[in-house]
């Protein structure tokens, strides 16, 4: 994997994690 692919994968992981936290927070967890 090159640095561009690693950057995109890490960005998607962080983005998905942030969305999950927002959803859980609004669910009242």
Curated annotation (Swiss-Prot):
GO terms for biological process: cytochrome complex assembly; photosynthesis. One of its GO terms (molecular function) is electron transporter, transferring electrons within cytochrome b6/f complex of photosystem II activity. Its main location: plastid. The keyword Transmembrane helix applies. The chain crosses the membrane at residues 3-23. One of its GO terms (cellular component) is chloroplast thylakoid membrane. It comes from the Eukaryota. It is found in: Plastid, Chloroplast thylakoid membrane. This is Cytochrome b6-f complex subunit 8. It comes from Staurastrum punctulatum.
